[in-house]
């Protein structure tokens, strides 16, 4: 035996790695690339990992992924896709209040259980009214009541099959001439459970199931398409009415109170106060205003990067905190204003403080890959907000274009001059609305096509689950418990270690992630 080898038992295991407290109390500002998590013991499969996380004090998601309120990232299409895959999207506010509220309404109407406020027409309405409703709402399975309003007697229903082959000159016909009459409809009585109603809908093979009371008055309706969505997207984020969850961004100015009212009417579940520096009297006053006027509406404050900033917003009553300043791929706040903080340090410091008050943290910015998501969650964040990682997906706003044979979509920071020129809301976010000379805190660029959210997000989910498996944790709750107890260990990486951890030593390679 070589003289340096020692024989004996395996009971001795040296202390290895650093605790999170040791890692982040060294005085250096760290980014996600500056450290690694040391692996643990595996006794379960990756698909057993539970990714359930708190977005706010009262909203829980099955997937810890959130899309950023940027005008090149999140409108209704993105918010719907994120909610269906278990996360949530925040509609940007670099637009008119009416446009933003309508985007929220599209999300809330996309999937429902009992629809208690459907589009309703009367027998004397015309075929062209159905086509207008279809263009406005995206569907045409419309119940017909004697007065054209909910709560009145059901007399029929109009579906696409009734109008598909009508000629232009027939668009002035009355609906009573072509609708499916009441006696031919399958209906369910008021008081039926959602499960029972879905079973009736399945057996009937109809597209819509009207719910009527003893007087045959319409009280609700259920759609077959929603039943199929419920089957296809088991992780979907929904409210108590079985509608998809949706968030929206607002500012902290007086005119944002009007925007807030429209969003509340549209059914928004949570608002994020969109500011690059959230520790301001303006945001504190807005938090108090919202909590007083809409006590059940969840409010996310931010952005913050220190415990001192977080304290003021927690005292004001926020339900969650958004953490990050200058770490986004299109953000130049740190470069231009010399303010901010490396993102990993910011997430750990704020999360460690906010957890004492039961306030979840959203890690916002600096996410370049699935490993960064796993690190943010391991440092105490409950969810991760993504901008560039979701930009250029099919569901992101904007049109694709080609450059040098590569398919791209535009992506810009909300602090870029490009975004500020589009709408005043971007200037408000950076306190620049009154400035004669605008100081850009972001840039405009382009991002390569990533395909659909419905393929990309499942890849992210699987990556997080495999990361938790390597750590030896069956849930994100366990990951954070291990981190705070000191059981989870970290290690700093030198620049050479970072090179070693990436692809190296190859003449050429193709990097396919999924």
From Swiss-Prot:
Co-factor requirement: K(+)
Swiss-Prot/TrEMBL GO biological process terms: 'de novo' XMP biosynthetic process; cellular response to interleukin-4; circadian rhythm; GMP biosynthetic process; GTP biosynthetic process; lymphocyte proliferation; purine nucleotide biosynthetic process; retina development in camera-type eye
UniProt xrefs under InterPro entries: Aldolase_TIM, CBS_dom, IMP_DH, IMP_DH/GMP_Rdtase_CS, IMP_DH_GMPRt
PTM entry text: Acetylated by CLOCK in a circadian manner.
Residues with the N6-acetyllysine modification: 511
UniProt GO molecular function: identical protein binding; IMP dehydrogenase activity; metal ion binding; nucleotide binding
Positions of the CBS domain: 114-173, 179-237
Binding-site list for NAD(+): 274-276, 324-326
Pfam families: CBS, IMPDH
Binding-site residues for K(+), renumbered to this chain: 326, 328, 331, 500-502
Record-linked PROSITE patterns: CBS (PS51371), IMP_DH_GMP_RED (PS00487)
EC numbers, comma separated: 1.1.1.205
Pathway entry: Purine metabolism; XMP biosynthesis via de novo pathway; XMP from IMP: step 1/1
Binding site for IMP: 329, 364-366, 387-388, 411-415, 441
Cross-link (Glycyl lysine isopeptide (Lys-Gly) (interchain with G-Cter in SUMO2)): 195, 208, 438
Active-site feature positions: 331 (thioimidate intermediate), 429 (proton acceptor)
Any Gene Ontology CC annotation: cytoplasm
Subunit structure: Homotetramer. Interacts with CLOCK; in a circadian manner. Interacts with ANKRD9; leading to its ubiquitination and degradation by the proteasome.
Family note: Belongs to the IMPDH/GMPR family.
NCBIfam families to which the protein is assigned, alphabetical: IMP_dehydrog (TIGR01302)
Protein name: Inosine-5'-monophosphate dehydrogenase 2
Organism, as annotated: Rattus norvegicus
Gene name, Swiss-Prot/TrEMBL: Impdh2
